[in-house]
Amino acid sequence: MKTLNRRDFPGAQYPERIIQFGEGNFLRAFVDWQIDLLNEHTDLNSGVVVVRPIETSFPPSLSTQDGLYTTIIRGLNEKGEAVSDARLIRSVNREISVYSEYDEFLKLAHNPEMRFVFSNTTEAGISYHAGDKFDDAPAISYPAKLTRLLFERFSHFNGALDKGWIIIPCELIDYNGDALRELVLRYAQEWALPEAFIQWLDQANSFCSTLVDRIVTGYPRDEVAKLEEELGYHDGFLDTAEHFYLFVIQGPKSLATELRLDKYPLNVLIVDDIKPYKERKVAILNGAHTALVPVAFQAGLDTVGEAMNDAEICAFVEKAIYEEIIPVLDLPRDELESFASAVTGRFRNPYKHQLLSIALNGMTKFRTRILPQLLAGQKANGTLPARLTFALAALIAFYRGERNGETYPVQDDAHWLERYQQLWSQHRDHVIGTQELVAIVLAEKDHWEQDLTQVPGLVEQVANDLDAILEKGMREAVRPLC
């Protein structure tokens, strides 16, 4: 069986007009998939150069397949029918590593046709890294790398106003475009780059904030042999995603024409303010995911679909959404309920979305996706929302890394992995009790951005829930909340 490459699988190749920081599954099944559709159905005619922003050789480079790969988009469509659509993506031309091909990276700025920059460098990617310098080859942080590339562009074209870029970050942080722009300006000032460059940044470039929404299930490990047999070729970069997607971009109205959205209908909205869309999605879709994962996994389930077909776990999630999340959100209730109904429908997607793959960086996800609603509920009602509080206890229990005597991988930053290993070891040895363990976790101001032990009743309630999970098991402990 042949492996994908452009010699054996000839077809359209597009001039390079898009730089993409990030080679991961999400961008490939979201941005590159949409660009591919626009290339086919309009005269967008734009190829993507993927820049690998971190120093790693895993996964291998997309260039090993000449940028080609297959997306398999599947799930329930708008009519509730199960669909599956395989598409050979030709929008990506090549991948370069900013670490091993730094000169090639800078040369991207010399191409007059370059117009767009997309990125997904994870929720931690748009951040300041002290000590990044102009001469670093490369700097460590993504914003510093981008600043250097923009300066290369500015210098090469002598500050021409028609050579600026439209920069569209897809990282899951609030107002990601504004945050990225502020960091680029910070590096420009820190590196004492000329005032003319700072003016050019402002006048010639657009930093657009976005909301991205698609569940991307990635490489379908369990089904690869069957899928490759159906496709007739080997593809080391197979990428699976759900049918539903939404891309909301806060940017100039002219963007719709530039991206040819007026010529082919995609679920892309160009808006003046993404805030309401963001709050709805992060609180309901991401919040429900984050509440569901530690509860369902420790109840013995492995995928989102299994969890939604389990009467008790499904009831827990739906009650969390309708009784504890929606009431504290600032949008019309009917609009929120209709979005929530679409979300739970998407969760019933018959294709496997592994709970463990969503569990990545669970501590940060809880802080950004659930904590605001938990605190708002407590403030509004004077009582803690029972299910969101239970989800926090379940999350702490999840970091034991053991289910029914078997270990499972827990992925989070090193600080939390070490912290939990130490705390659970002390708990097992009866050095600390459950309430003390919970208090230590909730007192981590650097993480929570506040001292959660000061929230009335929170330590006690989380400790009670955690004791119930440890003594009775997840099924018994969660039952009263279903």
Swiss-Prot record:
Pathway involvement of the protein, from the record: Carbohydrate metabolism; pentose and glucuronate interconversion
InterPro entries cross-referenced by the UniProt entry: 6-PGluconate_DH-like_C_sf (IPR008927), 6PGD_dom2 (IPR013328), Altronate_OxRdtase (IPR023668), Mannitol_DH_C (IPR013118), Mannitol_DH_N (IPR013131), NAD(P)-bd_dom_sf (IPR036291)
Group of enzyme by EC: oxidoreductase
GO molecular function, one term: tagaturonate reductase activity
Catalytic reaction equation(s): D-altronate + NAD(+) = keto-D-tagaturonate + NADH + H(+)
Keyword line: NAD, Oxidoreductase
Residues annotated for NAD(+) binding in this entry: I18, I19, Q20, F21, G22, E23, G24, N25, F26, L27, R28, A29
GO cellular component, one term: cytosol
SUPFAM superfamilies recorded: 6-phosphogluconate dehydrogenase C-terminal domain-like, NAD(P)-binding Rossmann-fold domains
The protein, known as: Altronate oxidoreductase
Taxonomic placement: Bacteria, Pseudomonadati, Pseudomonadota, Gammaproteobacteria, Enterobacterales
Name of the gene encoding the protein in the UniProt record: uxaB
